[in-house]
């Protein structure tokens, strides 16, 4: 049986405001899915909910990983089980080298029963694999000696996330706006890198609002999110249509979701004004 990450009728609130309103999606290993939609439609909320961010309250619905209840797992256990999220805005960790961070993260994922203080992956083995992955992704060796995201450009942050994904080898990877803030060349490089480390063993959900990141990652399925729900699913041609024509047809076809989208945007502006 093919392994899968299955989301069923998922409802999520943030600060008591409903964001996701019944999301259904199943991602199987070896598949690439694109989740597209206007800004503020709830795309990133789905990624955070999958990984168990405490600020995102799941009010109903389920997420299962190969039939197991993912929502019953702590966030670190979800990562150990093979689920990975590349953040839209990853945090910096001054004083912690990329190589040290990756060695700890890789050890914890590959040895899920390891306790704090127990030995890490042997240094020689780790360095060999890290060197191979960095060469594959065309990343300068000096990168591993820098502090995690400290002073990184937007492109460097995204490459650090992709390198982490390459080392952890998750079963399922959620890439949240990996193309955000990148120029055309950086997006193309990120797209190529994702394609190189994905393959038949990894299910990938690419969260984006345009199709540039899909240049080397043709989606098996394209989902459109509007007003906190997936309103339409198609193939790669749907992603191309959205890139060329925008979301006017989608809003006209799903007026209830469009009204919810407008309300969500108004609520978002009110929260920003208060903050």
PLM region spans:
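Conserved beta-strand-loop-alpha-helix hinge in the C-terminal portion
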Residues: 225, 229-252
């Amino acid at each position: 049986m093919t392994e899968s990450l299955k989301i069923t009728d998922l409802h999520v609130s943030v600060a008591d405001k409903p964001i996701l309103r019944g999301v259904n999606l199943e991602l199987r290993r070896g598949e690439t899915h694109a989740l597209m939609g206007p800004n503020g439609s709830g795309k990133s909320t789905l990624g955070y909910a999958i990984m168990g961010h405490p600020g995102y309250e799941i009010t109903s619905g389920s997420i299962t990983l190969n039939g197991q209840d993912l929502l019953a797992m702590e966030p670190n256990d979800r990562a150990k089980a093979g689920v990975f999220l590349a953040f839209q805005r990853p945090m910096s960790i001054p004083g912690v080298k990329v190589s040290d961070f990756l060695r700890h993260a890789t050890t914890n994922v590959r040895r899920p029963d390891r306790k704090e203080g127990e030995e890490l992956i042997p240094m020689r083995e780790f360095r060999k694999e890290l060197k191979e992955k960095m060469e594959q992704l065309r990343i300068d060796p000096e990168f591993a000696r820098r502090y995690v995201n400290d002073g990184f450009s937007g492109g460097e942050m995204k490459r650090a996330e992709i390198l982490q994904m390459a080392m952890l080898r998750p079963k399922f990877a959620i890439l949240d706006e990996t193309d955000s803030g990148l120029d055309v060349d950086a997006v193309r490089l990120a797209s190529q890198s994702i394609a190189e480390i994905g393959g038949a063993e990894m299910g990938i959900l690419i969260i984006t609002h345009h199709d540039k990141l899909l240049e080397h990652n043709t989606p098996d399925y394209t989902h459109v999110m509007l007003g906190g729900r997936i309103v339409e699913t198609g193939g790669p041609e749907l992603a191309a249509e959205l890139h060329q024509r925008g979301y006017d047809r989608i809003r006209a076809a799903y007026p209830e979701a469009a009204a919810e989208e407008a309300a969500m945007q108004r609520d978002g502006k009110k929260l920003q004004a208060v903050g």
